[in-house]
């Protein structure tokens, strides 16, 4: 049986992968996530997703290793995780009534056969008009300081949106399951057996 590894320390990504009911291990890779000068958002998420999976390749021979990474784009700028409540509030104030794009890179490497697949999924969030009070209450309650976009889709973040647009809502949480299943089938592992 093919052995599967998730290259992530994120409990949200593990919860998503659990939905496929496949046995897997997980480990948090340690890579430099700094964007390169003039690197496009697509190139960045491809590089980081593949880099996370590759970082674990030596520890997991004969495995399929999944890596993913996400960026938030607003006004043609890549926004990182807010890190503090003031930045999270400022981001959400900027997003009020606006469209924000998320790109999630996904990579699968097959260490047994020295091959890999890399892609990304796009997902757009259209925020409703938000009051300063709503933003303050949301940030105080959810503390989305380590989340791209300054919100958590898997929590109260859903209350901030007017609508969502994209192929796979799991993309917004950080692991596009539809594309992952396609990649796993290409690698010879059908989640349905």
From Swiss-Prot:
UniProt keywords, alphabetically: Cytoplasm, Hydrolase, Nucleotide metabolism
Organism for this UniProt entry: Chromohalobacter salexigens (strain ATCC BAA-138 / DSM 3043 / CIP 106854 / NCIMB 13768 / 1H11)
Listed name of the protein: 7-methyl-GTP pyrophosphatase
Keyword check for Thylakoid: no
Function description: Nucleoside triphosphate pyrophosphatase that hydrolyzes 7-methyl-GTP (m(7)GTP). May have a dual role in cell division arrest and in preventing the incorporation of modified nucleotides into cellular nucleic acids.
Catalytic activity, as annotated: N(7)-methyl-GTP + H2O = N(7)-methyl-GMP + diphosphate + H(+)
InterPro entries, per database record: ITPase-like_fam, Maf-like
Cofactor(s) required for function per UniProt: a divalent metal cation
One Gene Ontology cellular component annotation held by this UniProt entry: cytoplasm
Site (Important for substrate specificity): 12, 70, 154
GO terms of molecular function: nucleoside triphosphate diphosphatase activity
EC numbers, comma separated: 3.6.1.-
Class in the EC hierarchy, top level: hydrolase
Domain of life: Bacteria
